[in-house]
Amino acid sequence: MRLYPAASQMGRRSVEESVIDGYVVPAGAQVILAPWVTHRHPDHWEQPDRFDPDRFLPEREKERHRYAWYPFGGGPRACIGQHFSMLESVLALGALLRDFEFEAVDRGVRLGQGITLQVRSPMRVRLTPRG
């Protein structure tokens, strides 16, 4: 969800005029947030393209800016189902990893943009039942 967020961009409207890095963003302006970019930004992530689940250990999360990772948006317009989604993902992944070994068959993934991020090339995986 960090490297491949379902929503690679989301729109918001600025509530008040702001200056960001010398640019004036007027009140009411449409602003596009890009988790795809933020989640890979080296200011927030050391070796951003490397998969490292330890980044999300509680002691390391404290070091990170609150909005360096926002796959469900943030603030009052954050996805209402984010906690359910995280719980369901962990349970499903845990059950699959308990019962199967995974091996990638296809290398490299072609992605496309729609309302959500989409896989445009095969992403086959070989599953072998565990013991």
Regions found by a protein language model. Give the residues of each.
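Cytochrome P450 heme-binding "Cys pocket" and the immediately downstream C-terminal segment
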Residues: H83-Q118
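Conserved cytochrome P450 K-helix E-x-x-R motif and the immediately C-terminal K′/meander segment
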Residues: M1-D21
